[in-house]
Regions:
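Glycine-rich loop at the start of a catalytic domain that most often binds anionic cofactors/ligands
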Residues: 65-80
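Short acidic, glycine/serine/threonine-rich loops at helix termini
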Residues: 32-34, 70-74, 129-131, 162-165
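Charged helix-capping and loop-helix junction motifs
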Residues: 38-42, 133-139, 166-174
Length: 188
């Protein structure tokens, strides 16, 4: 059974109009083994088509896959700042790459009539050294959902409370969203 078949079957068997959280893993929507950003458009389109046929509210969190992991690993971004120009440049590149992937996801949703707005993780969230989210933009998600749109967000490089940087994973974001919204269903 494919991820999309499972998602589709579960959405259509549920007639409520409650919030559903979806995590699109980076290795699912990109070729994570690639050293260059490479997306898997078929799966993104499949999910977009499924959502377009639903009247439910959605928050989608996606991973970075090949749009962030290779450069983050190469420059040891999750180990904190090392003061080098190369690492600062790599942080900016990683952020640009995950925003590019977010735009691809948003664009594919838009093509099938699913209106989305993004909550840019590196602009709105901060974590501590144990990956607990300190600043969470619940009001941003609430505004998007109140407009009848799908809220999108993603794993990204964020500031931490020690004036350093860390990678905030999509899984951690999804866990926080689950704690805040207590959704009827969450799909990984």
């Amino acid at each position: 059974i494919t991820h999309c078949t499972f998602l589709c079957a579960n959405l259509y068997n549920d007639m409520t109009n409650e919030l559903i959280l979806i995590k699109l893993g980076g290795s699912l929507i990109t070729n994570k083994k690639s050293s260059q950003p490479e997306w898997r458009i078929e799966l993104i389109r499949d999910v977009a088509n499924i959502i377009s046929k639903s009247d439910k509210k959605f928050i989608i969190v996606h991973g970075a896959g090949s749009y962030g992991h290779p450069i983050a690993k190469k420059y040891k971004i999750n180990e904190g700042l090392d003061g080098s120009y190369e690492q600062k440049k790599a942080i900016n590149t990683a952020r640009m790459q995950v925003r590019e992937l977010n735009e691809i996801v948003r664009s594919e949703m838009d093509k099938v009539g699913v209106e989305c707005e993004s909550v840019i993780t590196s602009n709105t969230m901060e974590i501590d050294n144990e990956d607990n989210i300190l600043n969470f933009p619940k009001s941003d998600f609430d505004k998007i959902l109140s407009k009848g749109k799908v809220a999108l967000t993603f794993g990204d490089v964020v500031k931490n409370n020690k004036n350093d940087v860390r990678i905030l994973s999509g899984d951690t974001i999804l866990l926080k969203l689950s704690q805040i919204y207590n959704p009827k269903k969450t799909f990984f």
